[in-house]
Amino acid sequence: MAVITMKSLLEAGVHFGHQVKRLDPRMKRFIFSERNEIHILDLQKTLQGIKDSYELVQSVIKSGKKVLFVGTKKQASEIIEQEAKRSDMPYVNNRWLGGMLSNFNTIKKSVQKLKKLEKMEIDGTFEMISKKEVSQLNREKLKLSKNLTGIKDMEELPGAVFIIDPKREQIVINEARKLGIPIISVVDTNCNPDVIDCPIPGNDDAIRSVALFTKIISDAILESDKEVGIQIVENLNEEDLMSEIEVKNEKKEL
């Protein structure tokens, strides 16, 4: 059973939002306070978002569908790949190609082409053609691989999409909403939470925060067949929480 504590969220810097001037007004309901012109997110609502997302993910996996992990920003790319592979889920961590969801059949043809090129390399076909042709095919394979490797085994549309930084991944959101695919996403203070089915208020820039959220989703997938949920440990009262925020805020300013 995954155990999430308020302290672990604080240590990952989950509570730090953006500068006050960058606030999306629709995020006001997730704001706890303001410190040194930085918004502090309400971790109680973060915990609720984690719980809701955990339950949705497990429901999707039990239905036989997959969760597509998406995070193309520098801080998220490697983490998205690692956690998606750990839970044997599809992922996109380089660039979202328009139509990956809304034009899935066309994308599948590109995936089939990539698989064919990989097979040609393995079965000795490359050894039977000219170096010039091999060079051209390798360039084509590299180009396809860069954007499609993570979804090579995604035979059908996912049951849900998990996103890091919805502001950056707006095309993904538009496609998922059009198809009625549930969206789980970490929402920072500059994001619009209203287009997300399961918003998780949190820092989507700090690597430790991104890693924590992505691991939680991966854990939910891996534990879906064990009939276990998530344990939330709220081990800080409001006074302790404010004290921790002050300390963390001072460290951030240094």
From Swiss-Prot:
GO cellular component: a single term: cytosolic small ribosomal subunit
Keywords attached to this entry: Ribonucleoprotein, Ribosomal protein
Pfam families: Ribosomal_S2 (PF00318)
InterPro entries to which the protein is assigned, alphabetical: Ribosomal_uS2 (IPR001865), Ribosomal_uS2_bac/mit/plastid (IPR005706), Ribosomal_uS2_CS (IPR018130), Ribosomal_uS2_flav_dom_sf (IPR023591)
Ribosomal protein in keyword set: yes
GO aspect biological process, one term: translation
CDD domains: RPS2
Coiled coil: none
GO molecular function, one term: structural constituent of ribosome
Record flagged with keyword Lyase: no
Family as reported in the entry's similarity comment: Belongs to the universal ribosomal protein uS2 family.
NCBIfam families xrefs: rpsB_bact (TIGR01011)
Stored PANTHER family: 30S RIBOSOMAL PROTEIN S2 PROKARYOTIC AND ORGANELLAR, SMALL RIBOSOMAL SUBUNIT PROTEIN US2M
Record's protein name: Small ribosomal subunit protein uS2
Organism: Borrelia hermsii (strain HS1 / DAH)
Record lineage: Bacteria, Pseudomonadati, Spirochaetota, Spirochaetia, Spirochaetales
